Amino acid sequence: MGVSIRALHPWAVDAAEGRRLQQTLREQLCLKTPRGFRPRLVAGVDAGVVDGGRTIRAAVVVMSLPDLAVVTQSVARAPAIMPYVPGLLSFRELPGVVRALEQLDVTPELLLCDGQGIAHPRRLGIAAHLGLITDLPAIGVGKSRLVGTYREPRPEKGATSGLYDGHERIGTVLRSRDHVRPLYVSPGHRISHEDAVHWVLTCCTRYRLPEPQRAADRLASAKEAPA
């Protein structure tokens, strides 16, 4: 079954073309949650580099809601056709992520991505980009801030503070566990700011990261796992 991918552009682009594509693609983003949205399958998505930076290793872990039981998982490799360029991570990592998504035997209804959604200088972080090419609701869950200013949220789990670039809200700083560093949550595509926070918290249990993303992170970096 897998996930259907829309071929919106080639992946082999230089930095200038990548930035131009981001400016164009951002116009297609939707920050509204579909009416009656109640996902039953949520996927955590993560990717890293192996082979001295020559290969992208991507992992997707699909869990059921609300019990967060693992339904299936997928690992894939793809050549790193673009070097690391700040702000253009999606062009480097998504070819591997696409392969992993296409290998799934189920179709997730929500994607949680390690990285940014619209909390990005050109409003097209990896979660926004992935949401567009899959046409699935997608949320960026960043471990660190890429852009924007905010006030530190209170120390208890569930505390939030708006993340702003000037007067524009680009995300939410979320305390996902008591007295831990916050997460930087931003809508990617087909999800609102409020619902992005809701579903991230729904997927958080004992740890800082939401369970699907935490599982994908471990799978993407596990050298002993098949790929």
From Swiss-Prot:
The keyword Transferase is annotated on this UniProt entry: no
UniProtKB keywords: Cytoplasm, DNA damage, DNA repair, Endonuclease, Hydrolase, Magnesium, Metal-binding, Nuclease
Cellular localisation: Cytoplasm
Marked site: Interaction with target DNA: 84
Keyword Metal-binding: yes
A biological process term (GO) from this entry: DNA repair
Stored InterPro entries: Endonuclease-V
Catalytic activity, EC: 3.1.21.7
NCBIfam families given in the database record: PRK11617.1
Protein family according to the UniProt entry: Belongs to the endonuclease V family.
UniProt-annotated binding residues for Mg(2+): 46, 114
Name under which the protein is recorded: Endonuclease V
Annotated organism of origin: Alkalilimnicola ehrlichii (strain ATCC BAA-1101 / DSM 17681 / MLHE-1)
Molecular function GO terms recorded: deoxyribonuclease V activity; magnesium ion binding; RNA endonuclease activity, producing 5'-phosphomonoesters; single-stranded RNA binding
Functional note: DNA repair enzyme involved in the repair of deaminated bases. Selectively cleaves double-stranded DNA at the second phosphodiester bond 3' to a deoxyinosine leaving behind the intact lesion on the nicked DNA.
Example of a GO cellular component annotation carried by this entry: cytoplasm
Family annotation (HAMAP family): Endonuclease_5
Cofactor: Mg(2+)
Catalytic activity: Endonucleolytic cleavage at apurinic or apyrimidinic sites to products with a 5'-phosphate
Domain of life per record: Bacteria
